Amino acid sequence: MSADSRIAAITARIVERSKPYREPYLDRVRSAATNGPHRTVLGCGNLAHGFAVCSPAEKVALAGDRVPNLGIITSYNDMLSAHQPFETYPALIREAAHEAGGVAQVAGGVPAMCDGVTQGQPGMELSLFSRDVIAMAAGIGLSHNMFDAAVYLGVCDKIVPGLAIAALTFGHLPAVFIPAGPMTTGLPNDEKAKVRQLFAEGKVGRDELLEAESKSYHGPGTCTFYGTANSNQMLMEIMGFHLPGASFINPGTPLRDALTREATKRALAITALGNEFTPAGEMIDERSIVNGVVGLHATGGSTNHTMHLVAMARAAGIVLTWQDISELSDLVPLLARVYPNGLADVNHFHAAGGMGFLIAQLLRKGLLHDDVRTVYGQGLSAYAIDVKLGENGSVKREPAPEASADPKVLATVDRPFQHTGGLKMLSGNIGKAVIKISAVKPESHVIEAPAKIFNDQAELNAAFKAGKLEGDFVAVVRFQGPKANGMPELHKLTTVLGILQDRGQKVAILTDGRMSGASGKVPAAIHVTPEAKEGGPIARIQEGDIVRIDAINGKVEVLVEDIALKTRVPAHIDLSDNEFGMGRELFAPFRQIAGAADRGGSVLFH
């Protein structure tokens, strides 16, 4: 089925806007594919260094250009639960590559930080910038020009977007993303959130809180709520970087290993040495990007992807805007209720029908482009499947079920949870912002209240502990943008403001910083641009000004006369405390040149 005419029109607009960037990008991709990799043109010393530790048979294979070599880019470390399973993947990939007549080498490793560990800590100010560092680190690994395709091992928040930027920068190479899968279900996410609120209110101690957190985050795999990490997995599948059904299979299971083997063999099959050459830069086009945005809306995915998708698209010469994302939200229904948008976790989502059911439903209404290339072949309809373990450890795929196994978790396109998507763009005299409404109750979709000004999240937490946060208000938390301090997530404020909300106060957040993909019930107009450090209007808001956040009509404004607002002197604060410690001094150049939030907040693209 062809895409809905409205989806097609938005896609066509993106195509037209992107031409000055996309066409030169494709020229570079095709030139690189023609000129390399050709290991036989490497000097003998170069090549000897490249395969020094390989077996004699592998050296013979790599000395020519007829046996494909996979470059593995891994983000393994054993602190991140989602990345710990990758420890065994290189050996499994090498074995599968050998079975298929190829070779695989670890081309390089990239850093992988856990936002759950750094939340509310100085290290969080490196989080967004780590995405671009990951892209650059992967680029260094692939720069050896020894590889015919790359497989990318990554899961968490900034890691997958960074790896995707690298994959598209090396767009002449086929790219297959291989996930680790979610951890098994532990303490329900809503119960964990309740204990956090009780701790913030002083009603339980640290021991009780740590016990609850440990029962929630308890083993290998991705955190089970639907935050940025699991939104990453959805995106990689719906954009065609994953194999069908690969995203949400638990680690350490026979099916997980079978999918990893299959992904390896598929990566070898789509190199230029075979008959299905699928370079990543040509595979991912404007239709693929739109499919990613549609999936984000249909699942109530992470707000972080309003930045990451913009940066990922730009790496492929595609110019995606917040306006595109917002207009698509008006067309795409919400089909998933996964915490923080509901009580279920991603394991429940998968059991209800998962990605296969979701894709089938969206295709049926023409809300996705089916005519795309993927690592699995031509057409997204091949992803409308249910994946199982077949005989002899193979992967078996069947058509996705027509009915959801749990309508409270996964809805049909004819009976959605809401008729529009989970994310909206806001604009007004404060600038532009993004809001996630899928987890916010309808009565909180419009908030009009006096501003309380905070220049960091510590000030707000101190005011809460001092009992100073009374009545209705909008917490304006500013100087949190890319140029100010790297644009940290302010997720810990959700607990504090959630307590006030439960007491009957109408509260909201307005910030040039970010919120976690796990953030939920408190309305938050985030990613405000221009940011306060750049003298944006958010720096002109004063204590007591009435701020209106209207998610229904897409407005964010301070109710002050335009002339009065423009003549105010923007606030300036001393940010020197944010410049040192926990590695922040290393990122001073990044803060100086970082782009605006609506352009991806990147140092790579402006």
From Swiss-Prot:
Recorded hits in Pfam families, A to Z, give: ILV_EDD_C, ILVD_EDD_N
Give an example GO cellular component term for this record: cytosol
UniProt binding sites for [4Fe-4S] cluster: 156, 223
Which cofactor is essential here? [4Fe-4S] cluster
> Mind listing the GO biological process terms from this record?
D-gluconate metabolic process; Entner-Doudoroff pathway through 6-phosphogluconate
Which reaction does this enzyme catalyse, per its entry?
A: 6-phospho-D-gluconate = 2-dehydro-3-deoxy-6-phospho-D-gluconate + H2O
Pathway(s) per entry? Carbohydrate metabolism; Entner-Doudoroff pathway
Q: What is its EC number?
A: 4.2.1.12
Q: Which domain of life is it from?
A: Bacteria
Concerning Gene3D superfamilies, the annotation shows:
IlvD/EDD C-terminal domain-like (3.50.30.80)
Q: How is the cofactor bound?
A: Binds 1 [4Fe-4S] cluster.
UniProt KW keywords:
4Fe-4S, Carbohydrate metabolism, Gluconate utilization, Iron, Iron-sulfur, Lyase, Metal-binding
Annotated TM spans = none
Q: Which GO terms describe its molecular function?
A: 4 iron, 4 sulfur cluster binding; metal ion binding; phosphogluconate dehydratase activity
Which protein family is it in? Belongs to the IlvD/Edd family.
What does the UniProt record say this protein does?
Answer: Catalyzes the dehydration of 6-phospho-D-gluconate to 2-dehydro-3-deoxy-6-phospho-D-gluconate.
Against HAMAP family, the record matches this protein to: Edd
Q: What is this protein called?
A: Phosphogluconate dehydratase
Which species does this protein come from? Rhizobium meliloti (strain 1021)
Its organism's taxonomic lineage begins at: Bacteria, Pseudomonadati, Pseudomonadota, Alphaproteobacteria, Hyphomicrobiales
Q: What is this protein's gene name? A: edd
